[in-house]
Amino acid sequence: MKNKFVELVEKSQLRTDLPEFNPGDSITVNLWIKEGDKQRIQAFKGFVLRKRNRGLHSAFTVRKMSSGMGVERTFQTHSPLIDSIIVEKRADVRRAKLYYMRGLTGRAARIKEKV
């Protein structure tokens, strides 16, 4: 059981502007990157490998293929560095964690699209 004050502070920091998404969905995460004294938005486009719902400590992992190499990146859902999340395709998967996709390539790595 958490302290009521801690719950109140955490609730005030939760983001409500992000769309609903699930494992398997193809998304683009636009996040702020700081290079020297400049800031810019960088897009990371891939599919959601896993999602962890823990209130303020929620996180999700996005996987993409870059130059034939699999790249995974984990984001904190309520991070102020995330500018926006765009859901491009909804997927129809039967698992909550898609770790088996790491070993698949080509046609075997396709995800069925939700109609």
Swiss-Prot record:
A molecular function GO annotation: structural constituent of ribosome
Entry keyword annotation includes Cell inner membrane: no
Xref: Pfam families: Ribosomal_L19 (PF01245)
Top-rank taxon: Bacteria
Gene3D superfamilies in the record: 2.30.30.790
Family annotation (SUPFAM superfamilies): Translation proteins SH3-like domain
GO CC list: cytosolic large ribosomal subunit
Family the UniProt entry places it in: Belongs to the bacterial ribosomal protein bL19 family.
UniProt function note: This protein is located at the 30S-50S ribosomal subunit interface and may play a role in the structure and function of the aminoacyl-tRNA binding site.
HAMAP family: Ribosomal_bL19
Protein name (record): Large ribosomal subunit protein bL19
